[in-house]
Amino acid sequence: MTDNILGNLQQKKHNMNGNKISGAEAIIKSFLSEGVDTVFGYPGGAIIPVYDVLYGYKKELRHILVRHEQAAIHAAQGYARVTGRTGVAMVTSGPGATNIITGITDALIDSTPLVVITGQVGNSGLGTDAFQETDVIGITQPVTKWSCQVRRAEDIPEAIARAFHIASTGRPGPVVLDITKDAQVHTMEWHYEKCNFIRSYIPYPDISDEAVAQAAELINNAERPMIIAGHGVMISGAEKELAEMAEKADIPVVCTLLGLSSIPSSHPLYKGMAGMHGNIGPNVNTNKCDVLIAIGMRFDDRVTGDTSKYAPQAKIVHIDIDPSEFNKNIRATVPVLGDAKTVLGKLIPMLRKNGHKEWLTTFNRPEAVEYEKVIKPETEPSEGMMNMGEVARRVSEATNNDAILVTDVGQNQMLSARYFKFSRPDSIVTSGGLGTMGFGLPAAIGAKIGQPGRQVCLFVGDGGLQMTIQELGTIFEYKVPVKIILLNNNFLGMVRQWQELFFHKHYSETPMVNPDFVALCKAYGINGEDVVERKDLGQAIKRMLDSDEAYLLNVCIQPYNMVFPMTPAGSNVDNIMLNATEHYI
């Protein structure tokens, strides 16, 4: 690696005021120039100069001290997902830097814009195995959109400007800047210019009018069209266009897990969630539609199942800003490269006003079967211990379906996503592609800090909560009033479900002996209560939501709660289990 990785860049002298400042102060002033108001982080030796400068900028820049560096990334993700802004985190070298890897991988897969600053040893210590030296660039290159080491103070403003531009444009993602101690302590002439262009980086390619016209022709001639909306709809801010397109052409809309809330749950054309634990209608009709319009989604295996049997009858229109997603998993008849909002803006005027009444009625039977066989038993049980689905439904109803749902990973994620309802966009924060247990608690902190005026409800299992439970300390210190619904079944529930269905009920290392979670919350200065009986759930939810402070409900769930419907991994999407013994026919 050269001594100055940015040395080939022309040094900019715009907006210079003659003030010499340290590289550490340049980092803080660069953040402020980008409109950053919150940084999640954890100090250490190689980043101390920046924290020393931060001491004098407390009024301008809020810092949230997490209890583990992984949590800094997840909190920044939560913040970014609910605000549409770039999340910012800052950690030290060595273990501080290695602790961020899970978080930035999660952000890369789920297209979350982050700028992460890692401290690094001094220039002379590079490559010497100095104390807390790690090859941050080598480690992070595979799991970031861009990573760069900065060794000179004068290169810091341009590196940060580029980082924000790259992280937030095109398909968003995480950027890591590894800044040596020399760069932090040496001085430079302060200047800053936001980056709007990088040669060879084209975040918003020209949209092919021919491809849009071909897509319009397929949709106009379709008898059984279906839209599958992914996370890219909300990233581009195309929620209005999605609804307008669906209404004009009378097309049913289904969502991926990360696409939930891109259209209101109450919309008459919304037909549910697609995927392994999605609704029956969307999955069955994937293999019956004649034109499938995929918008801002990547045909993940949890949506497609067996790709050789996924929508073989359909012509597929795939709209995405990332060309690498085209034909990667599912071959598109018409790939349309571009930002979803811009593409739909061109496509909608070409669509004929249409009606598909008969096609829309084909969702009725699977909806009825799902209600009787799955939804009613899960959400309206009359006896026994509580189910996860009924808790999610009742919390959603108590918030008038207007809360931000944050989930951890596992059964809690799938059942809350299934039974929570959404009235406005950007209302779900979850770990989709990587499936990171421990994501939920810090992500909820970031979401609440980003949207303090909205109720933030975290659904988490007893396994996932204990992976980042130390962040209760962050909640207490900063008085972050998140509502934590702990679905406690004393199991690693999703793994246990697979063991029950596919591994002869060999519950190998999935039962859990748990602490007293309410007492633990009390030790952290957080309110909490146990909810054992169904009759007590309603008032407990009310007390939680009425509280102005953080609150935990430890809800005792029946240990063998299952998530259905379920399409077994690697199966075709219309091979759907209604329960352990019945399939949808």
Where are the language model's segments positioned?
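Glycine-rich, acidic loop regions that bind phosphate or pyrophosphate groups
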Residues: 5-6, 118-159, 259-363, 541
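Conformationally flexible catalytic loops at phosphate/diphosphate-handling active centers
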Residues: 166-221, 375-376
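Glycine-rich, anion-gripping cofactor-binding loops and their flanking helix/strand elements
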Residues: 81, 231-317, 422-454, 468-469, ...
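Glycine-rich phosphate/diphosphate-binding loops that line cofactor/substrate pockets in enzymes
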Residues: 24-36, 78-84, 108, 166-171, ...
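Active-site diphosphate/adenylate-binding microenvironment
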Residues: 24-28, 32-37, 45, 50-55, ...
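Thiamine diphosphate
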Residues: 48-123, 127, 131-132, 276, 281-292, 296-300, 414-492, ...
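Phosphate/pyrophosphate-binding active-site segments
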Residues: 5-18, 154, 192, 217, ...
